[in-house]
Amino acid sequence: MTMKKVEHVHATYDTPHLNAAVGVFALLANPVSVKMILAIRDIEVSANHLADIVDLPVDQTSHELHRLESAGIVSRQRRESGDFYLLNGVHAGALAEAAIFHAEHQQQER
């Protein structure tokens, strides 16, 4: 494998957002979080519905949703029928998808 010669931009790796980015990767290191992020990429769902989708108890699902909400990855919309969750933007979903595609590619190369 040949390495590309790349001109590094200092701001890309010396950023005040580095710790927050590492926090996002820490959340993505949890399979439950990745399942949830992938499940709500295109829809907003209640904690009960999401628990059914990811096959977890509602209390565990709610706990994980709170962690994702605290990190700013998901947001909660309060409605008369209850709370609904959705991704804040596409970035976390894109990271989770990229990780899955990377893992699939690595598996195919073996």
Model-derived regions: residue spans:
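Residue-level detector of secondary-structure transition/capping positions
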Residues: E44-V45, E69, I100
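Residues within the DNA-recognition helix of helix-turn-helix
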Residues: E64
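N-terminal helix-turn-helix DNA-binding core of bacterial DNA-binding proteins
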Residues: N19-Q60, R79-H91
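Residue-level marker of intrinsically disordered, low-complexity segments enriched
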Residues: M1-E7, I43, L56, A71
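Amphipathic alpha-helical dimerization/coiled-coil segments
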Residues: M1-A20, G89-R110
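Alpha-helical residues within the helix-turn-helix
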Residues: D52, E69-S70
